[in-house]
Every structure is written in structure tokens, then in C-alpha cells.
Design a protein with these regions (language model features):
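Short, aromatic-enriched amphipathic alpha-helices that serve as compact interaction elements
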Residues: 2-19
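A solvent-exposed, acidic/Ser-Thr-rich amphipathic alpha-helical stretch
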Residues: 4, 22-77
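Hydrophobic alpha-helical core bundles mediating ligand binding, dimerization, or RNAP-core interactions
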Residues: 8-11, 31, 54, 81-83
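A beta-strand edge to alpha-helix "cap/lid" segment located at domain peripheries
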Residues: 2, 16, 52, 58-121
């Protein structure tokens, strides 16, 4: 049985980690080497591409954190969960969305496709 909550927590920890070395370690625990990510604004292939993409988001949204919203849905090798990106010190989220993931046989992420529900400005 998959630990979907643990996988989602690691996935969000990747997005929130500002230390590059720690983030790369988290990526290796969370994503398969040939992983793919796609949302309306970003795309990345491979763990190096995912690391570069996350760093770019940190540069665009300094002082912000991703957090999960609500329960996850899962079946077979698929996973769906909501999230939001908001300032660490409170305030309304900049972006809300839902991610759909494919989980590899080893329990790591093979792919994530993100959709935005709402974005500020």
C-alpha cells in the first residue's frame, strides 16, 4: 500500500526547500530520475530540470510556501491533491491549484501535471 500522504508531504517539501543541496536530496527521494512536470506556466524533465524549475519559483515568489489543501484522492498509480502558494507570514494565496500525479512502482513520482484554480493579479 502506498503512503500517499507521505509522498505529497515530500513533494511539497521539495517546493518549499530553499537550500539547494537539501532540495536535491529531497528530489531524489521523491521523484524518479526521468520524471516530468507540467503546469500552465512551467515544465521540466528529469530531476535536474525539476530542481532548476523549483529554484526559479523561489526567485519569483520569495518568502512564499506551498501547502496542501484538503484530502488526496488516489487509485491505481494515480494521485490527485490540492495546494496553494501563499506568503509565509500569512495573507491570501497567490495561486491555488490541483496536481495530478503518476506514481512509479517504487513509490516515487513519475509525473505531475498541475492545474491552477485561481491566481492573484
Amino acid at each position: 500500500m502506498q503512503d500517499h500522504d507521505g509522498l505529497i508531504a515530500r513533494y511539497l517539501a521539495v517546493w518549499n526547500e530553499t537550500d539547494a543541496a537539501t532540495r536535491r536530496d529531497l528530489i531524489a527521494l521523491t521523484w524518479v530520475e526521468e520524471a516530468r512536470y507540467l503546469d500552465p506556466m512551467l515544465s521540466a524533465e528529469g530531476t535536474d530540470g525539476i530542481d532548476a524549475m523549483v529554484q526559479a519559483v523561489h526567485e519569483r515568489f520569495p518568502g512564499h510556501r506551498f501547502r496542501r489543501t484538503g484530502a488526496a484522492d488516489a487509485h491505481h498509480d494515480r494521485l490527485r491533491f490540492g495546494w496553494e502558494l501563499a506568503p509565509e507570514d500569512g495573507g491570501p494565496p497567490e495561486v491555488r491549484g490541483v496536481d495530478f500525479a503518476t506514481v512509479a512502482p517504487d513509490g516515487r513520482l513519475a509525473s505531475v501535471t498541475g492545474f491552477f484554480d485561481a491566481a492573484q493579479g
